[in-house]
Every structure is written in C-alpha cells, then in structure tokens.
Amino acid sequence: MNNVIVDCEIEDGNIVDVSLELLTKGRSLADLLNVQLDAVIIGKELKGIEQQVYPFGVDNVYVAEDSRLYPYETLPHASIVSKLFKEIKPEIALFGATSIGRDLAPRIASALKCGLTADCTSLEIGEHEDKKKKKTYKDLLFQIRPAFG
C-alpha cells in the first residue's frame, strides 16, 4: 500500500502527545506523497481509541487489543507490528523517540531488513539529481538529524 504509518503509544487509555505530533507530521508527508495516513495502536481496553486519532487526518487505524498488551512488552509488540508491516508494506513508518520507540523501531527495521534513522528533528520530501548518472530521484524522504563533532 506504501502509506505513511505512525506507531501510536498509549498511556492510561490515551494516545501520548509524541504520537499525536507524529500524526501531524505523518499527515503532511502523506499529503505530499498522495498516500494515506495509517495509525497502529496496541494495548488493552482500547474501545473508541480511534476517535483520538481521526482528528489528525488518519485514514486507517489498526488496533490490537488484549489485556496482555499493556503495559508494553517488547516481543508481543514487535511481532504484531512486524506482521502488520509485512502485510500492508508502508513506505514510511514513524515511531516516537521514547523508550518504547527506541526499543521497537530497530527491531522492526531488523525484522523487515529495512533502514532506520533515529533522532530526526525534521522530515521532508524532496528530490535528488545524480549528475553522474543523469537521473533524478523524486519523492525521497530527507531525514534531518543533529550532527555533533
């Protein structure tokens, strides 16, 4: 499907602020790429949780609900997200720079044999011209992150 997807973290039955911020950025990236914005929410007692993400322009919500899925545990969450991503094949996946996101995102990238950039401060869609090959690559994701030293 090549959509943009955001892994939404929950705390006390609510989507955490960092996930809402990522949904906002995800919506702008999805609009630039002319694709849909998806959200994945994993936890327990999630009835109506999708109502918290729809105001951010989410097109599809994937919910995995079970009493054993909250609080966060690495292996069950990684298994669920990996299987979902293999099925829907997102073009871009956004995870918060939280303890959960820093645990989950590299596991997903490893399982799917794909790239990962951490600690981005900005994400932009653009193009790159390879002058040697005389080829222009469009709709590239530029990941801006701080560089030290």
What are these regions (language model features)?
Residues 1-149:
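N-terminal glycine-rich FAD/FM-binding segment characteristic of electron-transfer flavoproteins
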